[in-house]
Amino acid sequence: MRVITTIAELRTARAALQGTTGLVPTMGYLHEGHLSLVRRARAENDHVITTIFVNPTQFGPSEDLTRYPRDLPRDLALLEAEKVDLVFAPDVSEMYPPGFGTFIDVGPIAAPLEGAARPGHFRGVATVVCKLFAITSPHRAYFGQKDAQQTLVIRRMTLDLNLPVEIVVCPIVREPDGLAMSSRNVYLNPEERRAATVLFRALRAVQERFAAGERNGDALRAAMRAVIDAEPLARADYVSVADLDDLHELETVTNRALASLAVRIGTTRLIDNCVLEA
């Protein structure tokens, strides 16, 4: 496994790889969710490139950029065990040199939910992912379903800009009690960690209502909110039952929908989702 920090060196190393290449972009502090993406990429491609870059342009001024967890030696040991070919771990100045001024606005798909709660977030995500695609020239790129809106944003960008990359979305990996794996889970104290299962419980509640025949969007959203409101340490940022393609809130679910939520547990903001399917 080779660890590379400059774009020039990465391009030289990439040019030497024959066959198909899978890209797994990450912000580091890897967990089993990330590793599931790496294993999928390993199974489906001749070579795997993983990137580790805490991207400052996707964090708002009051968000957790400076305290976002980092442990590069641990990450590299995990990736070596998975037989990753190349790891690209650039500095901020390598990705955003002085004078950098080009950003990607993906349009309406980036506006609701996470886009509304975190203005500018998807502008930063789309820009860095587009740059990583340009630098690594992958055949396929792997993302987790936990960041459902992000996957839609990246699909839209890839389609609109005619980028020759297949976007592969992989299932959410959960702890035994249902909490979706996230690098931010490390922020939770033991009491908050117990309370954080409220996200999974809320999704389970909406799935049960849907399975019982409920199709009214407001009723389904209320089912999630009731579970969150019953947890003293939890505060909902949003609950959503939305169209899977454009994320507009549904009055009635006729076929499939994305149920998603963002919840603050203490000072930690967590997201999760599931697909409702008849």
From Swiss-Prot:
GO molecular function of the protein, one example?
A: ATP binding
Pathway this chain belongs to: Cofactor biosynthesis; (R)-pantothenate biosynthesis; (R)-pantothenate from (R)-pantoate and beta-alanine: step 1/1
Q: Which Pfam families match?
A: Pantoate_ligase
SUPFAM superfamilies associated with the record: Nucleotidylyl transferase
Using the UniProt record, name the top-level EC class of this enzyme in a single word: ligase
The entry's keywords: ATP-binding, Cytoplasm, Ligase, Nucleotide-binding, Pantothenate biosynthesis
GO cellular component terms, A-Z:
cytosol
Q: Give a yes or no for keyword Zinc-finger in this entry.
A: no
The active-site annotation reads 34
Q: Name one GO biological process term.
A: pantothenate biosynthetic process
Under catalytic activity, the entry for this protein gives: (R)-pantoate + beta-alanine + ATP = (R)-pantothenate + AMP + diphosphate + H(+)
Per UniProt, (R)-pantoate binds at 58, 150
Provide the residue positions that the database annotates as binding beta-alanine. 58
- Cellular location(s): Cytoplasm
Which amino acid positions bind ATP, per UniProt? 27-34, 144-147, 173, 181-184
Q: What is its EC number?
A: 6.3.2.1
**What InterPro entries does the annotation carry?**
Cyt_trans-like (IPR004821), Pantoate_ligase (IPR003721), Pantoate_ligase_C (IPR042176), Rossmann-like_a/b/a_fold (IPR014729)
- Role summary: Catalyzes the condensation of pantoate with beta-alanine in an ATP-dependent reaction via a pantoyl-adenylate intermediate.
Further information: The reaction proceeds by a bi uni uni bi ping pong mechanism.
Provide the assembly information: Homodimer.
According to its UniProt record, which protein family does this protein belong to? Belongs to the pantothenate synthetase family.
Name of the featured protein? Pantothenate synthetase
Query: What is the organism field in this record?
Result: Roseiflexus sp. (strain RS-1)
The lineage is: Bacteria, Bacillati, Chloroflexota, Chloroflexia, Chloroflexales
